């Protein structure tokens, strides 16, 4: 049986994600962000609820990306996720994209020219953000064209780069429905942005989200729930440069901006520059929130849930892979577990996110 990996956030899970799972082949393993997202935001609903939604709509296994993989720039996010999926035996990687191109060809380009491409990046001025630099790199070395807002396409390029030397088949699937950032409700396949914007519209949510009750009946989290914690961390921290990726310039800008900022958007707008993108600033503010310092990654893979078919695959891997199905006295990943504890502080109804939790199990009627 073909084993297909999918890297996702499911923030939240919606009909477009269901379409991706239905279109992908074989047994589907999801490497999913935990309770904080790649762009530096708390998850709308917790990782366990999102895992359950995925497993009820086509996923066979859901594993958790550690904090220092989840909350990273596209290249590090892709590299960390693909490394985990390769340990779980994937043969191909499926992903949605605005532009279906020959990503397999791009793997070969990077395998042949990685040194030149990396050297080229270092020649570009620091006035360009890292995403702008990587786009220029792909334009020069592979003739890739960029038009408008295509975050999934850009992430696809990171997947190609991270897949070099790994013998993975990339399977791009054309993104259907609304654009990534669209807030338009007039789509059967509405975007996650639109769903987050219109959470109070039950009719819209029920048509846009499979198993919508799981979304509606659980706490909805945003930066608003954590801004006071963040403000305290910034004002009381003796040395922000001890936080991951915070340099002297950013520390100074953040310390000044927090004194006049009433919410996260105002703070991000005040700190961001052409060099420091808003997404990068949000990630750094997330690092400050959870007091993240030098990144370390766990050896084990945390299993959030599986179907009967997924369980059969995991049994084959158990002896050769460090699979974590329950976090107890022995920690899995200290940083992720600390981030989970802070996530819980945002709402009294968020249950324990780490200790004692066991995987969600969805029984398949058939194991074909």
Swiss-Prot record:
It holds the Pfam family HIGH_NTase1. The keyword tRNA-binding applies. It is found in: Cytoplasm. ATP binds at residues 7-20, 96, 152, 175. Its EC number is 6.3.4.-. Its main location: cytoplasm. Keywords: ATP-binding, Cytoplasm, Ligase, Nucleotide-binding, RNA-binding, tRNA processing, tRNA-binding. GO terms for biological process: tRNA modification. Gene3D superfamilies: HUPs. InterPro entries: Rossmann-like_a/b/a_fold, tRNA(Met)_cyd_acetate_ligase. GO terms for cellular component: cytoplasm. Signal peptide: none annotated. One of its GO terms (molecular function) is ligase activity, forming carbon-nitrogen bonds. It comes from the Bacteria. It catalyses: cytidine(34) in elongator tRNA(Met) + acetate + ATP = N(4)-acetylcytidine(34) in elongator tRNA(Met) + AMP + diphosphate. Catalyzes the formation of N(4)-acetylcytidine (ac(4)C) at the wobble position of elongator tRNA(Met), using acetate and ATP as substrates. First activates an acetate ion to form acetyladenylate (Ac-AMP) and then transfers the acetyl group to tRNA to form ac(4)C34. Belongs to the TmcAL family. NCBIfam families: PRK13670.1 (NF010191). This is tRNA(Met) cytidine acetate ligase.
């Amino acid at each position: 049986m073909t084993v297909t990996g999918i890297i996702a956030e499911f923030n939240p899970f919606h009909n477009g994600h269901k379409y991706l799972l239905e279109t992908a082949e074989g047994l589907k393993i999801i490497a999913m962000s935990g309770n904080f997202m790649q762009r530096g935001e708390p998850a709308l609903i917790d990782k366990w609820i999102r895992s359950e939604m995925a497993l009820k709509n086509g996923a066979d296994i859901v594993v958790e990306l550690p904090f220092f993989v989840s909350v990273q720039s596209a290249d590090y996010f892709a590299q960390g996720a693909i490394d985990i999926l390769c340990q779980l035996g994937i043969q191909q990687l499926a992903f949605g994209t605005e532009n279906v191109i020959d990503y397999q060809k791009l793997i070969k380009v990077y395998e042949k020219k990685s040194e030149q491409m990396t050297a080229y990046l270092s020649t570009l001025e620091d006035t360009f953000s890292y995403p702008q630099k990587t786009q220029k790199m792909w334009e020069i070395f592979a003739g890739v064209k960029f038009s408008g807002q295509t975050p999934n396409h850009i992430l696809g390029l990171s997947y190609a780069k991270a897949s070099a030397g790994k013998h993975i088949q990339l399977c791009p699937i054309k993104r259907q429905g609304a654009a990534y950032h669209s807030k338009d409700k007039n789509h059967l396949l509405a975007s996650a942005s639109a769903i987050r914007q219109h959470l109070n519209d039950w009719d819209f949510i029920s048509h846009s989200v499979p198993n919508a009750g799981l979304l509606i009946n659980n706490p909805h989290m945003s930066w608003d729930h954590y801004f006071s914690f963040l403000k305290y961390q910034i004002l009381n921290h003796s040395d922000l440069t001890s936080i991951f990726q915070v340099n002297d310039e950013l520390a100074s800008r953040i310390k000044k901006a927090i004194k006049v900022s009433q919410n996260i958007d105002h703070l991000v707008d005040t700190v961001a520059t052409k060099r420091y993108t808003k997404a990068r600033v949000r990630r750094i503010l997330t690092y400050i929130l959870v007091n993240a310092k030098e990144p370390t990654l766990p050896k084990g893979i945390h299993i959030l849930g599986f179907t009967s078919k997924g369980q059969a695959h995991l049994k084959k891997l158990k002896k050769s892979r460090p699979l974590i199905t329950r976090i107890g006295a022995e920690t899995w990943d200290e940083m992720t577990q600390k981030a989970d504890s802070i996530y819980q502080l945002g709402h009294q109804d968020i249950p324990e996110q780490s200790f004692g939790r066991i995987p969600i199990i969805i029984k398949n009627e058939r194991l074909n």
